[in-house]
Amino acid sequence: MYNKRNVESISNIDFTNQYLAQQSFEQVEFTNCTFTDISGTDFTDCSFIGCNLSNAVITNCKMYDVEFVDCKMIGVNFSDTKDFGFSVRFEKCMLDYTNFDNKKLNKSAFIDCKINGADFTQADLSKSKFTNCDLFGAVFLSTNLSGVDFTTSQNFSIDPASNNVKKAKFLSTDLAGLLTKFDIVIK
């Protein structure tokens, strides 16, 4: 991701009333910060640790090689970010009700995250990893899930007829999550 020796650290700052638009941050580690509007801001090789971005406005925000660790990001609309170079990684984050509609997220990583009610409609998640994630109520519709590994995640409901699931990985014990639309009982 980035070379930690050259990273600038910004900690314990509440950016709630600060205008960050048109600013660029490269190799910055934000720790325990709060953000409400980062529209038009560019982040390259940055890390957000323990930050609160819930309901933050991120319109036209650039995120290239950005990682989020232990962040609260409820209701964030990633569909509004710039598409070019979009590359993110999430670990131990709360991503409930986030929107990834039409987002290109191939090879992204979601590790130990709670992603309840998130919208992945028409997103490209090919070759992504969902490691130990709770996907209760997450919406997958016309989503590219080819090569995605769901083997350690739970509570998902995915219709194979409405999504590309070619070479996606599931545990046999989770097959019920693929058959939800049929309203059948599996024992």
What are these regions (language model features)?
Residues M1-K187:
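Tandem repeat scaffolds
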